[in-house]
UniProtKB/Swiss-Prot annotation:
Signal peptide stretch: none
Protein's recorded name: Tetrathionate reductase subunit C
Physiological role: Part of a membrane-bound tetrathionate reductase that catalyzes the reduction of tetrathionate to thiosulfate. TtrC probably anchors TtrA and TtrB to the external face of the cytoplasmic membrane. May transfer electrons from membrane quinol to TtrB.
Compartments, record wording: Cell membrane
Topology with respect to the bilayer: Multi-pass membrane protein
Predominant localisation class: membrane
Keyword Transmembrane on entry: yes
CC annotations in GO: plasma membrane
Record family assignment: Belongs to the NrfD family.
Membrane-spanning ranges: 26-46, 53-73, 104-124, 160-180, 193-213, 233-253, 258-278, 288-308, 334-354
Subunit structure: Probably composed of three subunits: TtrA, TtrB and TtrC.
Source superkingdom: Archaea
Assigned keywords, A-Z: Cell membrane, Membrane, Transmembrane, Transmembrane helix
Length: 361
């Protein structure tokens, strides 16, 4: 039995259909990192730390975060009904639908609110830089043509950034919250450290994609590279610790069913430990820095696949491990949202400047 939005509970035969949440859910869970990028942009503005990376954080964050509501995070079991999260949100308890739907709360209320706040924040931030850039999209300066006018906008930007921090932070644990609530999946309901695991993964994905974009854009600024490496390495070692602790907890239970997910967890933990070591080395030897985020993102892919796909293969009936049965078009479905996010990234990076002068920020 599983929850399907908006109809309610549905029943299935796990032996006829071992995989209910297809790999496309894995892609959307990756794109949640857009919320972390928006969070980093807001914190950078408020603290003054990593300020030169704010344009990159905003462009990447909006590109990723814009995509996540288009599919399975609205209804991972029945993604074709995703639009109903906006048209039929269950934000209040009714006789037909008792309680409040977490999916409706996030998709019908929190996503539009977070997106609108982030978009206004980004437009205000880029207003004067767009005037200085000129060209076709200079109208996005919204009449802000002087440093004095831009300075008057900064209090409003700080208020929006302060609002954006808690809104974005709530998204970092949303996939973990959604998976953990699926008590009909044995592995997920017993994955006690799922929320901190997702929190660490989103930071690794966010900082990893930012580091990759840093090199693709040929930026040369230690004020961006070094702090990003620090956050990236801290998230990697923390996530390795979470995975090791979770395996230790399962080991104390002595339950053989978790053998289906432990090998890939071990591999992911080793990858994240190696990532941490490489971040320390690359702080001195910059040439190896591009390897670090690629390795870390590979670890995230391994870990998410293990959680989402292998986690479903542990029988809910206690009958051992099931065989995976994926839909024929699973790869195209999994790649499409990531491709759309990359397309948005290309468009936004063409419109908005990836680097902003200090006096214009």
């Amino acid at each position: 039995m599983l929850w399907s939005y908006p109809e309610g509970f549905a029943y299935f035969n796990e032996f006829a259909q071992s995989i209910i949440w297809e790999p496309v859910a894995f892609s959307y869970a990756l794109l949640i990192s857009g919320a972390d990028l928006l969070l980093l942009a807001a914190l950078a503005l408020l603290s003054g730390y990593l300020r030169r990376a704010i344009p990159m954080f905003l462009i990447l964050g909006l590109s990723f975060f814009s995509v996540i509501l288009l599919g399975p995070l609205a209804d991972l079991a029945l993604p074709h009904r995703a639009t109903e999260i906006l048209t039929r949100p269950h934000l209040a308890s009714t006789e037909m639908h008792p309680g409040i739907s977490v999916m409706a709360l996030y998709g019908g209320l929190l996503w539009p609110l977070t997106f609108i706040v982030a978009l206004i924040f980004a437009l205000l931030y880029f207003s004067y830089p767009m005037h200085k850039k000129g060209g076709t999209f200079s109208f996005l300066s919204f009449g802000v043509k002087s440093e004095e006018s831009y300075e008057r906008l900064k209090p409003a930007m700080k208020v929006l950034a302060a609002i954006l921090v808690p809104l974005s932070a709530l998204w970092t644990i949303y996939p973990g919250m959604l998976f953990f609530s699926q008590t009909w999946i044995y592995a997920w309901k017993n994955w006690g450290l799922m929320l901190p695991m997702f929190f660490g993964e989103t930071f690794i994905t966010a900082t990893g994609t930012a580091l990759i974009l840093y090199y693709l854009e040929r930026m040369e600024d230690e004020r961006i590279r070094y702090p990003l490496l620090q956050i990236h390495g801290a998230a990697a070692i923390a996530l390795a610790g979470v995975l090791i602790l979770q395996m230790f907890i399962w080991g104390m239970w002595g339950n053989p069913n978790f053998a289906a997910v432990v090998p890939m967890m071990q591999a992911a933990a080793v990858i994240f430990l190696l990532t941490f070591i490489l971040t320390l080395v690359s702080a001195k030897y910059e040439a190896i820095t591009p390897i670090v985020p690629v390795l870390a993102l590979f670890g995230v892919v391994v870990n998410k696949w293990n959680l989402i796909i292998n986690g479903q293969l542990i029988s809910r009936a206690g009958m051992g491990v099931l065989e995976p049965e994926l839909a024929p078009n699973w790869l195209a479905e999994a790649v499409s949202p990531i491709a759309l996010a990359i397309l948005l990234l290309v468009i936004l990076s063409y419109i908005f400047p990836m680097e902003v002068e200090e006096d214009a920020a």
